[in-house]
A protein has these predicted regions:
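Short, contiguous pre-domain boundary segments
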Residues: 5-18
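Non-catalytic accessory segments flanking enzyme active sites
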Residues: 17-61, 65
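Rieske [2Fe-2S] iron-sulfur-binding domain
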Residues: 49-118
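Peripheral, non-cofactor segments flanking catalytic/redox cores
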Residues: 1-7, 29
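A short linear-motif detector with a strong N-terminal bias
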Residues: 1, 19-23, 35-37, 44-46, ...
Length: 118
């Protein structure tokens, strides 16, 4: 597989990218760091979580995310994994939960991400 520099050396301004740009893992790793981890990403619409406890799940570059509506209408986004053992907390695409509960050891997190019970 060609390196990023080899592909870039042949790239002509104003022309579309060669197939290698879309398949090269080195380029994807670079884009993850330079673009995806440093930019705002669309995750959903606020109307998808209208009520306190409503949540949607989302994945960004293999990182599971949960977005949940707080009791006062605020919106929180967290890694959808327990900080204890890394278990996925919300396994459904969407739903409503009064708290975020890890299925592994039942650690309980508030909607704002604070640990309530361990």
């Amino acid at each position: 597989m060609e390196t990023r520099n080899q592909l870039l050396s042949r790239q002509r301004e104003g022309w579309s990218l060669e197939q290698g740009f879309y398949l090269n893992p080195e380029i994807f790793d670079f884009e993850k760091e330079a673009i995806w981890k440093n930019s705002w990403l669309f995750a959903g619409f606020t109307c998808e979580i209208p009520n306190p406890g409503d949540y949607i799940t989302y994945s960004v570059i293999d990182q599971p995310i949960v977005i949940i509506r707080g009791d006062e209408g605020e919106i929180y986004a967290h890694h959808n994994t327990c900080r204890h053992r890394g278990s996925v907390i919300c396994t459904e695409e969407s739903g409503n939960e009064p708290n975020l509960v890890c299925p592994y050891h039942n650690w309980v997190f508030a909607k704002n991400g604070a640990l309530k019970n361990a």
